[in-house]
Amino acid sequence: MIELQNVGFAYNNKHTVFSNLNLYIDRGDIVSIVGNSGCGKTTLLNLIAGVLLPSKGEIKKSDKNIAYLMQDVTLLPYRTAWENTFLACELRGIPVDNIQKQAAKEILDLFNIETEALNKFPKELSGGMKQRIGLLQTLLTDASLFLLDEPFNAIDINALNSIKLYIWEYLIKSNKTMIFITHNIDQALLLSDRILIMRSPTKLLEIKPAKEYCSLSPDERI
C-alpha cells in the first residue's frame, strides 16, 4: 500500500512541483504514469522511492522492499550483459545461486534476449537491449514494489508483448506492485490496470480501469 496525503514538494524551496497531492495505490496494482515532459512524473516516482522528501504532507508505504529502475540503466562497463544481470541482487546481498540463474534464463527467453547478446559488454548493446537487461536486473531482486522510469521506450513491440505476459503473470501471482512512467499511452494501456494522467503538477486524472481511457474525450486524452 502507498498513500500520499496532501504532499507538497519544491526544489530548493523555490520551484514548486507539487502543492497538495493525494494518491492511493493498493498492493498488487500495476499503475502507469503518463504525461508530457516537465509535469512532475519522475519527481513523483522519486518521492515514492524516498530519493526525495516531501516539503509537506505524508507518504505512507506498507512495504520498504523497493526496487527502482531509473531512466539511465546501471550497467558496469567491464562486465558482460550476463554478469550485469545480477548486479542489483549483489548490491542487495541476495545470493546469486542456481535458482537465480535459472530464473534469469527463463525471463531472458521471454524478453527475446539472445545468448550471443549476453556475452557483449554494455558499449556493444543497443538501447533496447540495455533496457531489457536493466528490467531483468530489477525483477530478479524479488522486491515488493517496483518503480520504473521509462523502462520500455527503446523496446520493440514484439518484445513488449512478451514482457507484458511475464509481468502480469509474475506480479499478479506474487501480489507485487509496479508503478512505471511512460510517454506512450499504448504502453500504458498494454501493461497497466490503472493510468494516472499528469497534465501538470496540480492536475492528476486517474483512469481505473485503464481500458476506460478509450471513452475519454479528445481534450482529456494525452
Show where each model-derived region lies:
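Conserved ABC ATPase "signature" region
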Residues: 99-116
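Conserved ABC ATPase signature
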Residues: 121-125, 129
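Conserved signature/switch motifs of ABC ATPase nucleotide-binding domains
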Residues: 141
